[in-house]
Amino acid sequence: MGKNILITGGAGFIGSHVVRLMVTKYPAYQIFNLDALTYAGNLENLKDIENAPNYHFVKANILDAEALKDIFTKHNITDVIHLAAESHVDRSIISPLDFVYTNVIGTVNLLNTAKDFWKQDLSYENAHDGTWDSKRDHLFYHISTDEVYGSLGKEGLFKETTPYDPNSPYSASKAASDHFVRAYGETYHLPIVVSNCSNNYGPNHFPEKLIPLFIHNIINKKALPVYGDGLYTRDWLYVIDHARAIDLIFHEGKKGDTYNIGGFNEWTNIDLVKLLCTQMDEKLGRTKGESEQLITYVKDRPGHDRRYAIDATKLNKELGWSPSVSFEQGLAATIDWYLQNTAWLENVTSGTYQTYYNQMYTNR
C-alpha cells in the first residue's frame, strides 16, 4: 500500500539513515524529507538518493505552523516519523530556550497539524477503551531519547515503564515532547507510537558528539576533552541498527505503545576513547598509544548523568529486533567512513563550528 510519509529532520544524522532506508526499501512510498537545514542538517548526507523518484526534500521549520499545514495539504501526508530536534546537551545548557522552541513547540505544531489533517479519518467513538479505530491507516511516530529517564546507578536498565526524571534542559525538552505526543494520543485519539533510544554512532554524525568529535580531533592531533573522571557510562547503538528498528516499529509496532531501542553495549567514556585511540592509531599508521597522549580531563558539565543503559527486551520479544553490528565492528566502520570522507568532515567543521567548539572546550 502506498504511503506519503513525512520524515522530519531527515537531513540530520539519524534522520538521513531513516530516509535512505525508507526510500530504497519501499519504492511504493513517497518520502518527504522536511528539514530546516540548521547547523547539523546536511543534504550531502543524502546525495546518493537525491534523484530517487520517491524522494522529495522540503525545506521548512516545524516552528512554522502554516508551512506544516501547506505541506500536509499539498502532499496528502498519511504518516509522520518525527526526528527533528535540537539534541546536544552542551548546547542546551548554553541556550535552553532553543530546545524548548524546537523540541516542545515544534512537536506540538506537528501534532496539531496531523490531528487537524487526519481528523476526518479518525473515529472518536472509542475514547477510553485503548483501541484505535481509523478509516485510513495513519501513524505519528515520535523518536526520543533514553536521557528522559535520568541517571542510572551501577545496576539496572531503563525499561519502558521507568519513570521520567530528566536532568538537563535537553532531556527536559524531550520529556515534554514525549508527554505531548502521548497526551494527543489519549485526548484526541491520534494514532501514535514512541521510541526511546540510547546513544547513536555511525557515518554522517555531526562532530559535536563524542565519537565524531574525537575522530576529528585525533586526525588533527588536537586534545581529546574527557569530562570529569571519564567514568560516565553510555549504551551505544549503531545508527543503521537504529534505522532498522524504526522501520520495524513503524510497520509492526502497536499503536499507543512505547519501545526502547538499545545496543546492549555499555562503555565508560574513557574506555571508549582509549579504544577509539587504538583503532585510529592502527588506521593512521601511528605509534601505538600516540593518540592516547591527546586525552585531557576537563571540568565536568552541569547535570551530567552518570549512566544510561537501555533494556530493549520488549522490542526483541515482540518484534524480533536485535542489534546486527558489534560495537568494535561499528566503530571500525565509522572510523573508515570519516577517513574516507575528510572533505565532508572539514566542510561541516568550518565557520560557526569553530566558535562553538572554542566556547565549549577551550580553557575548561
Predicted regions, residues:
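Conserved GTPase G-domain signal focused on the G5
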Residues: 204
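Short secondary-structure boundary micro-motifs
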Residues: 82-83, 200, 208-209, 291-293, ...
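N-terminal Rossmann-like NAD(P)+-binding domain of SDR-like oxidoreductases, especially those catalyzing
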Residues: 1-200, 240, 250, 269, ...
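C-terminal substrate-binding subdomain of Rossmann-fold SDR/epimerase-dehydratase oxidoreductases
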Residues: 5, 18, 31-32, 38, ...
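A glycine/serine/threonine-rich, flexible loop-to-helix segment
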Residues: 49, 156, 207-215, 276
